[in-house]
């Protein structure tokens, strides 16, 4: 089996985490090769991958496109390793190489979608590319029912669309009082009420709205602090905003953190909030939002934005609250209600843990992907 993708560690992001977790499940039962771009730290990562039972082949640049050099290397890998199935980790654009993969000997083509294909589906030339992918692939997977509703017509009536949302490692993401104390000590938060937003720092994620909400949150729940976890191009803008609003000393910017510290940073939260919003006339949208489920698995109540598939990760009113990510008053109310009522927040956290355990296990998701990759079972209508 060959995974061809632009999105793979050690580069970090939502798609990278999604694919890495599925690879971890697949290697239990499959021989797997990953073809991905080079990235800082790749040599060390690839050595660990080899010890875990799969090989990673790196393209010499940091971006792979459906062009001759990538096509040639892919075809060579198919021949060298007797590849029967090629899985394109993100359908757009690399799954345009599907016909070449078949001619090189692959018998089955699977292409996974995320959130950016929604934007592609709104552009005429890109829609044509998606139609070609839908016509050629044996299966096209989607992470949320929202994304399916937005791009299904672009992939065309012959596309076999299958629901393949991510899972959560509920052993790794779990309530952890020791980690909570350790992280709070690291950032000097003590016993303060803490709101955590863990995400790449880009406008869609809504960190700016949490900073705007913080003055009123602090009036309602004294001593509240906001921890913005992650790195990204929006950092300096957010820092200026916190300073302009007079709350800079109450906002912690951790910048990027190691992947192994993600659960510990969730653990320090009283509330997890990422009030995402759709931007760019619908081109920039939240495909699903696994981070909400990771917070739930850690026993933390969540506040999610009503963007794309994000509401599918929350049982509204039970594991958290879904709000309009453009409405600072709604965000303030949702977060403030949870901070002001620790008993209710704790009950939502417990419900979230059960939600993750009962419905979002990686083992179940991995078994379904293995079926789709092998073709052992007929594709089921989503």
Swiss-Prot record:
<feature type="binding site">
    <location>
        <position position="205"/>
    </location>
    <ligand>
        <name>GDP-alpha-D-mannose</name>
    </ligand>
</feature>
<dbReference type="InterPro" id="IPR028098">
    <property type="entry name" value="Glyco_trans_4-like_N"/>
</dbReference>
<dbReference type="GO" id="GO:0046488">
    <property type="term" value="P:phosphatidylinositol metabolic process"/>
</dbReference>
<comment type="pathway">
    <text>Phospholipid metabolism; phosphatidylinositol metabolism.</text>
</comment>
<dbReference type="GO" id="GO:0043750">
    <property type="term" value="F:phosphatidylinositol alpha-mannosyltransferase activity"/>
</dbReference>
<keyword id="KW-0328">Glycosyltransferase</keyword>
<keyword id="KW-0843">Virulence</keyword>
<keyword id="KW-0444">Lipid biosynthesis</keyword>
<dbReference type="InterPro" id="IPR001296">
    <property type="entry name" value="Glyco_trans_1"/>
</dbReference>
<keyword id="KW-1208">Phospholipid metabolism</keyword>
<comment type="function">
    <text>Involved in the biosynthesis of phosphatidyl-myo-inositol mannosides (PIM) which are early precursors in the biosynthesis of lipomannans (LM) and lipoarabinomannans (LAM). Catalyzes the addition of a mannosyl residue from GDP-D-mannose (GDP-Man) to the position 6 of a phosphatidyl-myo-inositol bearing an alpha-1,2-linked mannose residue (PIM1) to generate phosphatidyl-myo-inositol bearing alpha-1,2- and alpha-1,6-linked mannose residues (Ac1PIM2).</text>
</comment>
<keyword id="KW-0443">Lipid metabolism</keyword>
<feature type="binding site">
    <location>
        <position position="294"/>
    </location>
    <ligand>
        <name>GDP-alpha-D-mannose</name>
    </ligand>
</feature>
<dbReference type="Pfam" id="PF13439">
    <property type="entry name" value="Glyco_transf_4"/>
</dbReference>
<dbReference type="GO" id="GO:0016020">
    <property type="term" value="C:membrane"/>
</dbReference>
<dbReference type="GO" id="GO:0008654">
    <property type="term" value="P:phospholipid biosynthetic process"/>
</dbReference>
<dbReference type="Pfam" id="PF00534">
    <property type="entry name" value="Glycos_transf_1"/>
</dbReference>
<protein>
    <recommendedName>
        <fullName>GDP-mannose-dependent alpha-(1-6)-phosphatidylinositol monomannoside mannosyltransferase</fullName>
        <ecNumber>2.4.1.346</ecNumber>
    </recommendedName>
</protein>
<keyword id="KW-0808">Transferase</keyword>
<feature type="binding site">
    <location>
        <position position="200"/>
    </location>
    <ligand>
        <name>GDP-alpha-D-mannose</name>
    </ligand>
</feature>
<dbReference type="InterPro" id="IPR050194">
    <property type="entry name" value="Glycosyltransferase_grp1"/>
</dbReference>
<comment type="similarity">
    <text>Belongs to the glycosyltransferase group 1 family. Glycosyltransferase 4 subfamily.</text>
</comment>
<feature type="binding site">
    <location>
        <position position="257"/>
    </location>
    <ligand>
        <name>GDP-alpha-D-mannose</name>
    </ligand>
</feature>
<keyword id="KW-0594">Phospholipid biosynthesis</keyword>
<dbReference type="GO" id="GO:0009247">
    <property type="term" value="P:glycolipid biosynthetic process"/>
</dbReference>
<dbReference type="GO" id="GO:0033164">
    <property type="term" value="F:glycolipid 1,6-alpha-mannosyltransferase activity"/>
</dbReference>
């Amino acid at each position: 089996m060959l995974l061809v993708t632009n999105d793979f560690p050690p580069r970090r992001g939502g798609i990278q985490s999604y694919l890495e977790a599925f690879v971890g499940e697949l290697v239990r039962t499959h021989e797997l090769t990953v073809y991905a771009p080079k990235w800082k730290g790749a040599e060390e990562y690839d050595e660990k991958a080899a010890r875990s039972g799969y090989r990673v082949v790196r393209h010499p640049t940091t971006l792979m496109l459906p062009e001759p050099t990538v096509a040639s290397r892919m075809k060579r890998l198919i021949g060298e390793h007797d590849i029967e199935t090629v899985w394109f980790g993100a359908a757009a654009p690399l799954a345009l190489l599907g016909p070449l993969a078949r001619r090189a000997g692959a018998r089955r083509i699977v292409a996974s979608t995320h959130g950016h294909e929604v934007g592609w589906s709104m552009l005429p030339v890109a829609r044509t590319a998606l139609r070609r992918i839908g016509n050629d692939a044996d299966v096209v997977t989607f992470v949320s029912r929202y994304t399916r509703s937005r791009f299904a017509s672009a992939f065309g009536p012959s596309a076999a669309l299958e629901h393949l949302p991510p899972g959560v490692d509920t052993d790794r993401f779990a309530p952890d009082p020791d980690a909570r104390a350790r992280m709070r000590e690291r950032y000097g938060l003590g016993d303060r009420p803490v709101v955590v937003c863990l995400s790449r720092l880009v406008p869609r994620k809504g960190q700016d709205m949490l900073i705007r909400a913080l003055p009123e949150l602090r009036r309602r729940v004294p001593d509240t602090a906001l921890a913005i976890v992650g790195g990204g191009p929006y950092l300096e803008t957010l820092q200026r905003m916190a300073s302009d609003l007079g709350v800079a000393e109450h906002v912690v910017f951790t910048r990027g953190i190691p992947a192994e510290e993600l659960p510990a940073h969730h653990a320090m939260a009283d509330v997890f909030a990422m009030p995402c919003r759709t931007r760019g006339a619908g081109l920039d949208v939240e495909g699903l939002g696994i981070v909400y489920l990771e917070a739930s698995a850690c026993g933390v109540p969540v506040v999610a934005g009503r963007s794309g598939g994000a509401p599918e990760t929350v049982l509204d009113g039970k594991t958290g609250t879904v709000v309009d990510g453009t409405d600072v008053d709604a965000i303030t109310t949702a977060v403030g209600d949870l901070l002001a009522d620790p008993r209710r927040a704790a009950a939502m956290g417990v419900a979230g843990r059960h939600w993750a355990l009962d419905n979002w296990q990686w083992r179940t998701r991995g078994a379904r992907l293995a079926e789709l990759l092998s073709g052992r079972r007929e594709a089921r209508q989503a």
